[in-house]
Amino acid sequence: WSVLTETSLYNSMSTWGDNYLVANVWYTSHLWTHWRYTQDKEFLAKAFPVMWDCAQFWFHRLIEDRGFDSTKDEQERVRNYTPAYKFDPDGTFVAPNEFSAEQHDNQTEDGTAHAQQMIYYLFQNLSDAIGILGVENTGLTTEDVAKLNLYLEKTDKGLHTETYTGSWGATYNGVKTGEKLLREWKYSPFDISND
């Protein structure tokens, strides 16, 4: 369920972002989009097992949020010019060690916005598909549905905000001190990256 996602027209590949494990969710999202466009229940019934297999991968891969403390290794923090920040665990499920598709100079982190939003979208689509097809037509047990509902309830949705502190200047990339930002990272602040 993980692939190299940087494939060119000439069939060559790149290992940039080679830990892009959420690619499977990206691919299965197109199955749901096809259903939404066509309303073809026969297609949805064929697509459902693929979407469910993808969800099972994430049931095993997601971890309970472990929080983050940039001050644990003070020498490393200073060497990388990382600001001091700390987040306590919040009890949600997060995708471990993912990268943000829009940022290239920050390390991977648990619970990036892109990964979390895609995974939550998959779980929501499956819940909707069960409602459309009827649980009896999906091959799922009541335990399977309960597990999906648990993950749907406890998975971090990938929507976090912060207030820009002005640490890179009063205005940085058009953002003014005190303005609210939508985060790409669950923990790392806006000013962590030069991208």
Where are these regions (language model features)?
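Long, well-ordered core segments of solenoidal/helical folds
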Residues: 50-66, 152-163
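Active-site core of glycosidic bond-cleaving carbohydrate-active enzymes
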Residues: 7-16, 20-37, 41, 45, ...
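Catalytic cores of extracellular degradative/oxidative enzymes
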Residues: 1-22, 32-33, 38, 42, ...
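Structural recognition of the beta-strand scaffold that forms the well-ordered cores
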Residues: 1-3, 26, 93-97
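Acidic/histidine-rich catalytic neighborhood
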Residues: 53, 57-132
